[in-house]
Amino acid sequence: MSNPFNVVGINPCCVPSKSRADELAISQRMSVERRIVRAGSVDGMVKLDGGPFLMGTEDREGFPADGEGPVRETHVDPFYVDATPVTNAQFAEFVKATGFVTESERFGWSFVFQGHLDPERYKKLVEDTVLIVPWWCKVPGAKWDRPEGPDSSIASRMEMPVTQVSWNDAWAYAEWAGKRLPTEAEWEYAARGGLEQQTYPWGSELTPEGKH
């Protein structure tokens, strides 16, 4: 690897733009006593050989505004990536060690998928929705350890992937873990599962043989 950090497997949602200024701000906010764990370790990671692949899509399922097209040949160097997403337990360890405060905690709210809210909680908690995608609901108090709002909990979900994590939060976690976030090309290369120009890692059909 040309980069000294390994890639961490974290799945932020509603990803904001990033800048070096954001990165420096995060670094400054973190405790000077933070400890770097697993630095250089590849435990729980898989190595991908890299090489050329066709990146992007021109399929109608893609979003042109996200720059997903045109399809172009891209090359990635060999790299490691976490075999599984970062769990609530792992993120909790990071927060305990550093005192890190996520962006949703500082904002005081986050988006919650409508399907995760029963009708009663939807009526009680939701302040607003996104105009074009109304299934994303603005919920006050939603954060990584209260993912569906103040009355929710991750106590029974410690080994499930952490949610309500922004790009900046993920960047901070990766730095603490002695790793880094994947580039867009690395992420797409890994997510394609070795298949070329297929919609999903298993092919182009969402539910082959009725299974997803």
Q: Model-derived features: where do they sit?
A:
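Acidic/histidine-rich helix-loop elements
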Residues: T57-G67
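Short amphipathic alpha-helices within nucleic acid-binding modules
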Residues: A92
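N-terminal pre-domain segments of enzymes
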Residues: S2-R38
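Non-catalytic, well-ordered alpha-helical segments in soluble enzyme domains
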Residues: A97-T98
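Acidic-aromatic/histidine active-site loop/patch
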Residues: T87
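Well-ordered beta-strand positions in beta-sheet-rich domains
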Residues: V71-E73, P78
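Functional-site microenvironments in short loops/helix caps that host divalent-cation chemistry
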Residues: K18, A25, V42, K47-L48, ...
